[in-house]
């Protein structure tokens, strides 16, 4: 072997040794960082401040490389500061954590890490909303910088849901505008390719307008949400949209439309395994009674299994009393089941309508054999004050459901069915004759011209 060959061999051997040494050093550093991380974890139960310092050393050992262990350590530091209520330092450590999300780690891994922090602050009752908003704002800015649109959308949606739960409708409206903008084409119309995102936005917006009772906006959004065909929304989302639609129709006393929507909402919640199905079933029963349907809502295949559910049983009994026009039983069920019926603000809004319906049915049946009846007697039968009886009678007379008049002096209702029958027959014929006369006059005028 020549001297040159010897030299070449020695150089190669030296280079290989260096590579092995570098690899060993790297592995050694990796082991050291990993050990430091787990040592820090062991300090949490003993002393959180010491654990924080130990986790900070993990970050220092990475020498600015922003690796996996630094990502985990800063996430832990953020959570530990939160645990001890030091929210200012929590925010500072979170600021240091966010640049690690720009690393080569997978999007799912990053999203999981971010969500663990966001869920932590969102579910707390000890941290102020302004601080929570700062955490979200920092996250959203970081996600925009990295052009991670999918996670940005989901994070914004998470913030929007939180603001809805806290009834912060002003802040929520701004977030919803940003979300809408992200799903628009250049001409400002909805990008139908983003159907799933649009349905999520509409569902949240519909809930907001339901709570604020803005039926004008609600109608438009409800229609738009149902028109989206480019996505198959999660049944829970459709349950939300349909439930809000039912409430919208109830506000306008469109009982049949409300019944349809509540039934669809119930089915969707049931499919999703969502506990909201029970509440929607109650609303379905409510709408069914208000529309004076003769069909028992529990006769349907979907609702039948819940007929004897403890939370539904009171509504089942209410339907039975309602169908029998048993006022005393109806009122007793309401009184005995305040928690499952009357404590729901939405149901409570329509109890008077139900009572009016059942009182009307009992009253009309009560009046059949009489031509004259005392208001005090009706009051006793309906279990309401005489003043309420008078109001109900006036309303029914104006609606042409009762043909008679109230004698205020003797406090009685006088019915004149024979006269009324002839009167109404004459009125109908007279109205029909007038309409024919107007039509005939219009035709003659056209012929003359």
UniProtKB/Swiss-Prot annotation:
All residue ranges annotated as the PCI domain in the record:
251-420
Binding partners and assembly: Component of the CSN complex. The holocomplex is comprised of 8 subunits csn1-8. In the complex, it probably interacts directly with csn1, csn3, csn5, csn6, csn7 and csn8.
Q: Which UniProt keywords apply?
A: Cytoplasm, Nucleus, Signalosome
Q: Please explain the role this protein plays, according to its UniProt record.
A: Essential component of the COP9 signalosome complex (CSN), a complex involved in various cellular and developmental processes. The CSN complex is an essential regulator of the ubiquitin (Ubl) conjugation pathway by mediating the deneddylation of the cullin subunits of E3 ligase complexes, leading to modify the Ubl ligase activity.
Subcellular localization, per the record? Answer: Cytoplasm; Nucleus
Family assignment?
Answer: Belongs to the CSN2 family.
| Signal peptide segment | none
Name the principal localization, coarsely classed: cytoplasm
What protein am I looking at? COP9 signalosome complex subunit 2
* Annotated region described as Disordered, given as residue ranges: 1-32
Please indicate which superkingdom the organism of origin belongs to. Answer: Eukaryota
Q: Which SUPFAM superfamilies match?
A: Winged helix' DNA-binding domain
Q: Could you tell me which species this protein originates from?
A: Dictyostelium discoideum
Quick one: a GO cellular component term?
Answer: cytoplasm
Supply one GO BP term: protein deneddylation
């Amino acid at each position: 072997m020549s001297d040159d060959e010897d030299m070449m061999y020695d150089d190669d051997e030296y280079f290989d040794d260096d590579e092995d040494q570098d690899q060993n050093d790297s592995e050694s550093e990796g082991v050291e960082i990993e050990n430091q991380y787990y040592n820090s974890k062991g300090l949490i139960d003993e002393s959180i401040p010491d654990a924080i310092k130990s986790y900070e050393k993990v970050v220092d050992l990475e020498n600015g490389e922003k690796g996996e262990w630094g990502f985990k350590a800063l996430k832990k530091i953020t959570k530990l500061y939160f645990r001890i209520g030091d929210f200012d330092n929590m925010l500072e450590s979170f600021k240091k954590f966010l640049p690690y999300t720009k690393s080569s780690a997978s999007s799912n891994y990053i999203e999981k890490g971010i969500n663990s922090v966001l869920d932590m602050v969102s579910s707390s009752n000890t941290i102020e909303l302004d601080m929570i908003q700062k955490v979200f704002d920092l996250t959203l800015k970081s996600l925009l910088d990295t052009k991670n649109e999918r996670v940005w959308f989901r994070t914004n949606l998470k913030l929007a849901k939180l603001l809805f739960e806290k009834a912060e409708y002003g802040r929520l409206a701004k977030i919803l505008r940003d979300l809408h903008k992200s799903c628009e084409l250049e001409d400002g119309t909805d990008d139908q390719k983003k159907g799933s995102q649009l349905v999520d936005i509409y569902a949240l917006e519909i809930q907001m307008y339901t709570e604020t009772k803005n039926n004008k906006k609600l109608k438009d959004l409800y229609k738009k949400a149902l028109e989206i065909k480019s996505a198959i929304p999660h049944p829970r989302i459709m349950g939300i949209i349909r439930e809000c639609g039912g409430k919208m129709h109830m506000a306008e006393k469109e009982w049949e439309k409300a019944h349809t929507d509540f039934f669809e909402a119930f089915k969707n919640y049931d499919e999703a395994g969502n506990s909201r199905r029970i509440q929607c079933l109650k609303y379905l029963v409510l709408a069914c009674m208000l529309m004076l349907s003769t069909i028992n809502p529990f006769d349907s295949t979907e609702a039948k299994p819940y007929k004897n559910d403890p939370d539904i049983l009171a509504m089942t009994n209410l339907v039975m009393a309602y169908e029998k026009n048993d006022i005393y039983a109806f009122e007793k069920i309401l009184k005995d089941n305040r928690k499952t019926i009357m404590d729901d603000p939405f149901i409570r809004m329509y109890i008077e309508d139900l009572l009016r319906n059942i009182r009307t049915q009992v009253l009309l049946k009560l009046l059949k054999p009489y031509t004259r009846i005392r208001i005090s007697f009706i009051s006793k039968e309906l279990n309401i004050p005489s003043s309420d009886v008078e109001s109900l009678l006036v309303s029914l007379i104006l609606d042409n459901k009762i043909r008679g008049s109230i004698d205020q002096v003797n406090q009685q209702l006088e019915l004149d069915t024979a006269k009324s029958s002839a009167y109404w027959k004459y009125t109908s014929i007279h109205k029909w004759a007038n309409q024919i006369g107007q039509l005939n006059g219009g035709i003659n005028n056209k012929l003359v011209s």
